[in-house]
Amino acid sequence: MTAPSINFTDERLANGLRLIISEDHLAPVAAVNIWYNVGSKHEVPGKTGFAHLFEHVMFQGSGHVAKTEHMALVQAAGGTMNGTTFLDRTNYFETMPSHQLELALWLEADRMATLLSALNQENLDNQRSVVKNEKRSSYDNRPYGSWFHKLQEYVYPPDHPYHHPTIGSMEDLDAASLDDVAAFFRTYYAPNNAVLSVVGDVEPAQVRRWVERYFGEITASRTIPPLPSFAVSPIIGKETREVVEDRVPLTRHFFGFRAPVMGDPRFDALEVASQILAGGKGSRLYRRLVREDRIAQDVSFFALGLIGGASIAAGQATVVPGVDPAIVEAAFEEELDLLAREPVTDDELARARALIETYELEALQRVDERADRLSSYATLLDDPDMINRQLGRYLAVGAKEIQAVAAEVLRPDNRVVLTYVPAAQAGATTEEPAA
């Protein structure tokens, strides 16, 4: 299978909106994907959770669309839509029959231009309650639900914008006024803070006319503040451990590490290393902990790319009942140490490359994935052509690069270990080894 060359245009409207168009007439489908350069890292102390709150508010109507009708109109036209928020960004997206493309563009423009005219105290209170319920169901009351938030707190220092979770503080949301959240929207949800990608069975000239018609008169934001410094030491500088008593069925270890930023070649090497460690049943961690030693029920390891000073590498292992959790932790860490001590074999490297190549090529077959990646690379790296180069970067990673990044990242003084245990088994809190 050969990687396709994805052709696209990249331009800006007078108000700053970045428009990327990629034409593909293979199927009568079009994807619309808008990324706003706003995530939880843009929030300030005392006003957290606003970016995630708007992920909900954006579906509660705008100036010319009734409450909940954005979703209803898209579904009635045979399309799908959704939105996500994370540390670095927020995105909203539709996949439509190509003859319904104009509807999706109009809906996104109406939200950008007129959302605040439909935002009232009742809507704010309702969506605030929805977010609280989401926090209870997805984090507070879900087994192991707090693990990533705890990693954030340990991997990033308290003054770093990644230290707090995207869902935010419920106290901050309770204290937020209608004026507070409206000011946040006016600041960040503006054409000069957005990338709009349109991919699929489209005519670029017509797309430009529609985008100019619906987005062209929206006023740019003049109040986007500079971000605080993201500078952070490449390593945490100590190992941190916590035993978490929780309503969980089995003991599970989580491991976290500070890692190079997305776009750094070392991050590419870390992603390839993740496949060698935990990419399927032939990976090192699965083969040893699950298949051979039979001490873990499941294992995983992945690298999460971020652009603000440091990314996160993380893994987990669920302990088989009756096995000493210390044995599982030791085996997991031995495999990480081995990756730093000795080069991977040619067979392991070929297998990891094949897994990545298959995943990447399958993903790029879909117009919605192409639209998302174009918006992502433009927003985070200012380089949408990375869509044509990223696979080559992965395939260029060799054994030396993997060994080097493992030695740099997967080291004890850069490690967080969270051990979740069933409530009756807990017997410790936080431990930090003596220097």
Feature annotation, model-predicted:
Residues 1-40, 64-100, 138-193, 217-264, ...:
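Non-catalytic beta-strand/loop surface segments
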Residues 39-47:
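Short pre-active-site segment immediately N-terminal to the catalytic Zn-binding motif
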Residues 49-62:
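Active-site SXXK
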Residues 60-64, 113-122:
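Short, polar/flexible loop-turn hinges at active-site or ligand-entry regions and domain interfaces
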Residues 87-93, 120-133:
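Short, glycine/charge-rich beta-strand/loop segments that flank catalytic centers
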Residues 106-111, 209-215, 328-334:
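Short amphipathic alpha-helices in soluble, non-transmembrane regions
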Residues 208-224, 340:
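Glycine-centered hinge/linker elements that transmit conformational signals in sensory
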